[in-house]
Amino acid sequence: MKKQKGYLVFDIGTGNARVAVVSVTGSVLTVEREDIEYSTETLYPDSRYFSPQVLWKQVMNLAKRALSRSCDIDIIGLTSTSQRQGIVLIDQNGNPFLGLPNIDNRGREWEAGIPDWEEIYSSTGRLPTALFSALKLYGLKQRQPSLWEKTASFTSISDWVTYQLSGILTYEPSQATETLLFDVKQNTWSEEMCDIFGFSPSILPPLVRAGTAIGTIANEYASELGLSINAKVIAGGGDTQLAVKSTGAGLEDIVIVSGTTTPITKITEDHGDTKHKAWLNCHTDQGHWLVETNPGITGLNYQKLKQIFYPNETYEVMEEEISALAKEDHACVAALGSYLSAEKNALTRGGFLFDAPLSAHLKRAHFVRAALEEIAFSIKWNFDILTEVTPFERDYVWVCGGGFQSKALTQYIADLLQKKVYVQEGYHQASVVGAAVICNETFQLTEEMSANVRVIEPKDCQIELALYEEWKQTQRFFSGSESKVLI
């Protein structure tokens, strides 16, 4: 029997690393995952890092496990996707030696001292905050000069994976967008941005578009994984861009991706002024951009609350208990992030507001539902900002990502936005499926991927809109000052 063709996809998220085997038809056949081990760098108030050597050993073991469960697949290509903003530093000998994830904020102390904010925004499509890679490097240079001197180059986490597999160092534009060193409108590295941050352009790898066959798998890893030495290593892209790609959404569509954060994106051919209210990103499709608003950390908060309130239960149990609550029974309101602030992922005070003394009817489900509603409210807030920047008249939005495994969240979005919600089959593994889509384009395969789309219709939302207003007041309460809140 002839083996089915497929791909080995590495997906390095914020919370965990995954390796999947995906068929050319987009079916995710096996997925293996483990949490990523981060360490804290005490030289900074808010810093995380990881060991590339430890993570590489981890993902190779995941790859072996995934392949062992997919014996009837002929792997013709390998690719990768990852969290955006995260980077891996490489020394003069070509050895990766330090990983800085998206949640590393070591550059925050120097944000205010960065000059030429308007020039940076005009060129890169974002303001210089600690979220982006250049500020991570800048903080390293200021406080850990010995590590900076050791740095010959750096690349995104997804491009680090393809570097490991092929031995060829590249940077893909949808990831380069997140560095603050990339001219997003011209799709090229910016020497002017390097000058602003005091970096030599020599640290920047060659740019390679998503879907480019970089090379073939190194003999060492072909042998270790039991793959053909002819298997191609293909440039991947940012997890948001590949998730958007998986939906099949077209120009001018809006796609909401619910994961660690929740990007709300519009696909466009235009790279006009985003008025300091949105980011402008390269898409994996040449000539297309994504205009994005993003509330910051969302799904990661929900995951942590599960660990607190439902440590031994599944998400399905959480969903059942949430659905058992009366629609009008809102015993508490959540404020778990600076969702109305211009600064994403900033450290802030937060919590839940509820009546005191505690009601005998207050249950754990009230807290997790409040957190889920907050994700929906933060999406509405950012959706409204996005549609101010770039008008949107369609009666639907696309959604994807693991967060939309919650039927409650999906219905909240339909109700609050008063839009139909389109959910493509495979939505919960969107970045992995999107990786298979770009690989198919590389191999010029025309296999039909699933076109099964579920449609969620909006319902009356008067209760939700009233709660939305209450949530905004709760955000004000925890912000401590209305001047910090964009409302």
From Swiss-Prot:
CDD domains named among the record's database cross-references:
ASKHA_NBD_FGGY_YoaC-like
Q: Recount the UniProt induction comment for this entry.
A: Induced by sulfate, part of the yoaDCB operon.
User: What Pfam families is this protein classified in?
Assistant: FGGY_C, FGGY_N
Q: What name does the UniProt record give this protein? A: Putative sugar kinase YoaC
Q: Which gene encodes it?
A: yoaC
What does the record give as EC number?
Answer: 2.7.1.-
Q: Which GO terms describe its molecular function?
A: kinase activity
Which biological process annotations from GO are given for this protein?
Answer: carbohydrate metabolic process
Print the keywords alphabetically: Kinase, Transferase
